[in-house]
Amino acid sequence: MVDIREWVKTFSAAMEEAFGDRLLFTGLQGSYGRGEATEDSDIDTVVILDHLDAADIKTYEQVIDRLDRRELVCGFLSGRQELLNWEPSDLFQFYYDTIPVMGNIDEILSLIDLEAIERAAKSGACNIYHACVHNMLYEKSLDILKGLYKAATFVIRAVSFTDTGEYTSDLISLAEEVCLQDRNIIYTFSKLREGRPADFEGIDVYKRQALWDACPTGATERIP
C-alpha cells in the first residue's frame, strides 16, 4: 500500500514547484485521509489555486503524470473563488473530510451553516433511497450497494453533526455515537468492505433492505 505521508509530501512539493505563490492549498481526502484505505483505494487530493483556467489543468495533469502511483490519483482541483461560490451543502463534507497538507480552507466555514448541513443530510438520504430501489429492481449490483452504504456513512455523519456539533470521521467512534439503526448501517458497510459475496443475490436480503428502509425513517424524517 502507498506510504501516504511521503506521497503527499512529494505531491505538495511538486504542486508548489509548478504553481508557486498561486498555490493556496493542498490537502488529502477520502479513505487515505480517514485511515480506511485498502490496496485499491484512490488517492484523493485537493488543490486550490488563486484561480483556475484550462492551462492550469494541463499543468496539473503534467505534474501528476510524473508522480508515483499516478493511476490512483483522483480528487479536486479548483480556483479559490469557485470554491467560495460552491453549494454550501456540498462544502460540509468537503471541509470536514479534507486533511490540510499546505495552507487551509477555513474561509469556507462561514458558508456551512446548520441549514446547509441539514440539506446535505436530506439530499443524501433521498439520493440513496432512489438508488437503492433502482439497484434492487434493475442493476442488482454488489458494487453499487457497497457504494450506497459508503454514501450512507456520510449522511450519518451529517445527521450526527446536527445533534452534537462535532464531525466524527472514524467509523468505529461514529458507531458509538449514533442510534441502533445507523450503527447497523455502519457495521454492514464495514463488513461489505472486508469481503465480497459471490453476487448481489448472495447478500442477506436484510442488508439490501435495511439501507433502503433507513432513508425515509432516518434522515428524511429526522431532518426537517
Task: List the predicted regions and their residue ranges.
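Metal-dependent nucleotidyltransferase catalytic core
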Residues: 1-18, 34-39, 46-88
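Conserved nucleotidyltransferase catalytic core and NTase-mimicking acidic/glycine-rich helix/loop elements
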Residues: 9, 110-224
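Secondary-structure boundary/capping signal
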Residues: 23, 53, 71-72, 167, ...
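Short gly/ser-rich loop at a beta-strand->alpha-helix junction or flexible surface loop bordering the NTP-binding
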Residues: 23-32
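Alpha-helix C-terminal capping segments
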Residues: 66-67, 98, 134-136
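A general structural signal for short secondary-structure boundary/capping elements
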Residues: 73-76, 89-96, 122-123, 194-195, ...
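Hydrophobic, well-structured mid-protein blocks that either form specific transmembrane helices
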Residues: 86-127
